[in-house]
Amino acid sequence: MATVIHNPLKALGDQFYKEAIEHCRSYNSRLCAERSVRLPFLDSQTGVAQNNCYIWMEKRHRGPGLAPGQLYTYPARCWRKKRRLHPPEDPKLRLLEIKPEVELPLKKDGFTSESTTLEALLRGEGVEKKVDAREEESIQEIQRVLENDENVEEGNEEEDLEEDVPKRKNRTRGRARGSAGGRRRHDAASQEDHDKPYVCDICGKRYKNRPGLSYHYAHTHLASEEGDEAQDQETRSPPNHRNENHRPQKGPDGTVIPNNYCDFCLGGSNMNKKSGRPEELVSCADCGRSGHPTCLQFTLNMTEAVKTYKWQCIECKSCILCGTSENDDQLLFCDDCDRGYHMYCLNPPVAEPPEGSWSCHLCWELLKEKASAFGCQA
């Protein structure tokens, strides 16, 4: 037969008992808060639809024990049934009678009755979803418990996130709160700037290598720029120079006469309209298009190299080895001289574009360790 403990505090100790009760209360509060977040749900193990109920009590509801061995008592709460509106009994919630299609455009009473029905339904939902003050207080208590637990674990979570960032630097980063999230976003931006140094000055898109940026220029911005330049030339140029962009002008010796303006900023050699400084133009040997090296995103090596051979713009670019411009999606551009090479014309052939910078064999022999791909290309 079980013995009744009249005063359990003496058997366990006052401090131990208070700590045990506090831990039990904290655990039950967290458990109830987590369960209330998921309500209502269908329990897959028991097949019971779990819903909110009124069996949970708060600390302020405690009362002294009445029976021997009873520590606390809680007030009984009467069961109550939710108030519901029954459509058959409510005169405002009558079903609309089906009218012939001919009478629908003639009578507008259907619309008014329909709006009245909707308003009544909304009022019914408001009556059904009313929550008394005690239930709101219990919800607030649950939220306070969850917030306290989050504040305790916030420091540990941020430390774990800081340790995980280097391992997941190539994955999409989630938003973190506090200054740590700002630092991580700044580090992610600087890492992206380092990995993709070639940036489009028109839309700001970044690329790992120069061929990708050139392809982006050719297929995204060059066509729209040609249309804008043609309109500007029609409004500002004489009629005999309207087709200057489409038909290259040739001199007496048969060479193409280069344009005296940049196709990107429309400035001349005396001034780059983007930087405001004088800059020498680089012209295409086939069509005569010109551009500033900075507008073309040229490096120092590339700016010096294009003066040593007949440079071609992205529209006229052809393979140096085979001399054709077919299969332009297979063209590789050297990051030091901007020459084009088919991947299948190289020796040995290349199946996929290399990651990072790429230098041709001519630049390797000329620049050696100063080549852009030095240390990146085997």
Swiss-Prot record:
Tissue specificity remark: Expressed in the heart and somites. Expressed in cerebellum and spinal cord, but not in cerebral cortex. Expressed specifically in post-mitotic neurons (at protein level).
GO BP terms in the entry: chromatin remodeling; muscle cell differentiation; muscle organ development; nervous system development; positive regulation of cell differentiation; positive regulation of double-strand break repair; positive regulation of myoblast differentiation; regulation of G0 to G1 transition
From what organism does this protein derive? Answer: Mus musculus
Q: Where is this region: Disordered?
A: 146-193, 225-254
Q: Could you identify this protein by its name?
A: Zinc finger protein DPF3
Molecular function (GO) terms for this protein are: zinc ion binding
* Start-end of Basic residues biased regions: 168-186
Q: Which InterPro entries match?
A: DPF1-3_N, Znf_C2H2_sf, Znf_C2H2_type, Znf_FYVE_PHD, Znf_PHD, Znf_PHD-finger, Znf_RING/FYVE/PHD
Where are stretches of biased composition, namely Acidic residues? 148-163
Q: CDD domains of this UniProt entry? A: PHD1_DPF3, PHD2_d4
Q: Which gene is the coding source of this polypeptide chain?
A: Dpf3
Q: Mostly located where?
A: nucleus
Q: How does it assemble?
A: Component of the BAF complex, which includes at least actin (ACTB), ARID1A, ARID1B/BAF250, SMARCA2, SMARCA4/BRG1/BAF190A, ACTL6A/BAF53, ACTL6B/BAF53B, SMARCE1/BAF57, SMARCC1/BAF155, SMARCC2/BAF170, SMARCB1/SNF5/INI1, and one or more of SMARCD1/BAF60A, SMARCD2/BAF60B, or SMARCD3/BAF60C. In muscle cells, the BAF complex also contains DPF3. Interacts with acetylated histones H3 and H4.
